[in-house]
Amino acid sequence: MAIKHFLQFSDLTLDEFEYVIERTRIIKRKFKNYEPHHPLVDRTLVMVFEKNSTRTRLSFEAGMHQLGGAAIHLATRDSQLGRGEPVEDAAQVMSRMCDIIMIRTFGQDIIERFAANSRVPVINGLTNEHHPCQVLADVFTFIEHRGSIKGKTVAWIGDANNMLYSWLQAAQVFDFHVNVSTPKGYEIDPTLVAADNTHYKLYAAPSDACAGAHLVTTDVWTSMGFEEENAARLKAFDGWIVDAAKMKRAQPDALFMHCLPAHRGEEVAAEVIDGPQSVVWDEAENRLHAQKALLEYLVLGKLS
């Protein structure tokens, strides 16, 4: 199989995603039943972190171990990357010593340059522009709870950040719709959305974006790297909290998701994230299973 990277959601086809989602279901079932599943024995994952992480590191490191392989954690500050080694050189070296690489960094250009010089698959663990692994887990979580996501409506309330851009790509792949509501000054960057993407609609009022939605989702108002804007963002995002009133505008059985960590009382009310419509803990756990399926696919291809 030719090298396949997962740098943004659109890097895989619908057929590939359907395979990975089915493998996620099987792998999760095996995990719950304590059935050994070790397809990646003697394989090594290198995890490169320029941004801090809890869920990404845990899910990839535990996942690779559960698949029978090994995971190496490498913080850029502890490597030559932190001392100015060119990304291209680091990619050439690392990819000769492992089987797959996951990178969590700032600019998408960094991971694109790395992948262009890598001899093994590269996975985007998060960049400022995209968070495809999280949305893969989110789509699986929706399917797990509600069945097919095709034709459904997802409401995105809050910042036009990496999560939103991955959701918009997912909407094109899986053929669903995204209602987007962001405050003035924090709107979608058109350069990060495909020109032919007709699977979303913009709303000025967040409550209107929630109307009829099958899933309501949000993220923190201040992402990593934008901490100096926090005070201005708190003011600008006033009114964009996902609360019970907004959830009532959605479908009666609508789900709520958040990629975490969450700030109760800011982007989401405690009554929502801790309420019966919230599936955030399943969503977080499914990072583990979805990424195991992704690792398996990118290293081994489709299993017969």
Curated annotation (Swiss-Prot):
Catalytic activity, reaction form: carbamoyl phosphate + L-ornithine = L-citrulline + phosphate + H(+)
Gene3D superfamilies named among the record's database cross-references: Aspartate/ornithine carbamoyltransferase (3.40.50.1370)
GO cellular component terms, semicolon-separated: cytoplasm
Segments passing through the bilayer: none
GO terms, biological process: arginine biosynthetic process via ornithine; citrulline biosynthetic process; L-arginine biosynthetic process
Pathway(s) per entry: Amino-acid biosynthesis; L-arginine biosynthesis; L-arginine from L-ornithine and carbamoyl phosphate: step 1/3
Superkingdom field: Bacteria
GO MF annotation list: amino acid binding; ornithine carbamoyltransferase activity
Sequence positions that bind L-ornithine: 162, 219, 223-224
Family the UniProt entry places it in: Belongs to the aspartate/ornithine carbamoyltransferase superfamily. OTCase family.
Annotated HAMAP family: OTCase
Entry protein name: Ornithine carbamoyltransferase
Species name: Herminiimonas arsenicoxydans
